[in-house]
Each structure stands twice: as structure tokens, then as C-alpha cells.
Amino acid sequence: MALILGTEYCKMDSNGRFKFPTAFKKQLASDESRFVIRQGFTAECLELWTFDSFQIEVQMLSKRLNEFDLEDRKIIRQMTRANIVELDSNDRLMVPPERKSVLGNAKEIVLQSTGKCIEIWERNAYDKMNDNVDDLAELVNKRLGGQHELPSAGDAE
């Protein structure tokens, strides 16, 4: 699974369809057309995962959590509450009806890469979220300051 990078602005039609950006498609393997959409956890957005990367994420989650523990089970259930979607013949994805409420009646959306997945934001909510990152340098220093070791090539996979 390729690491998808970038930010793309898209139009969404009344049926919840949007054209998957060419810039993102070029970063995928030629046969990748299945995706998973789920509710974002820390933001007013959706998360779009390639099908393969979502399977890996769920496998890693399963290794860390105990499916017999009620709290862990709740996390697993929430993390896997998702929909599988596929690119149509026009390279469009459709946001499932039960997920559209997160985006409201958006006509403009923003696809923002996080490295692992792509967040889907309603344009105004995205702009508002970005207005709140004035203290980004302070936040980066707080969370990453002093961590100067670079990962080895094997750690990046």
C-alpha cells in the first residue's frame, strides 16, 4: 500500500459522489479501487482507507486489544464500523448515505492525507479546523521536541 500524500479540493454531487483525485490515484497501485469509509474519531470528518491498508490496521488493532474485554470490544466495534466503497467507471467514490450526515449538505469537500488514510472534510469545517492551528510550532515541539532519531528504513513500512 502506497503512502498517499497531499490535499485535494473536490466537488460532491447531491448523491454523495465525488471524483477521486488523479493526484491520489497516481499514488496507488493500478489495481487499487476498493476503499473503506468510516467516521473519523477526533474530528468532524470521515476517514477513507484503501481496502488493504484498512485490513492491516484492523489486524494490528486485533493484536493490541482483547476481544473478550468489554472496553476493548467497544473500541474494536467502533473502529470496524465502516463501509466498503469502490471507484466507479468514472473514478468516482460515493459516500454511503449513513455517512453523509458528517459532511452535511456539502458541495465542496477537502481530501486531506494523514499518511495512513485520507480525511474527508466539508470545506468550511476544514477551513475552520485549519484556522485553529496557529500554535502548530508549539504543538510540534510539545509532541515531538527532543525526538531526533530518524527511523531506519525497515521502520517506515
Q: What kind of feature is each model-predicted range?
A:
Residues 29-45, 82, 101-129:
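A short beta-strand-loop micro-motif that forms or neighbors metal/cofactor-
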Residues 2-42:
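A positional/architectural concept
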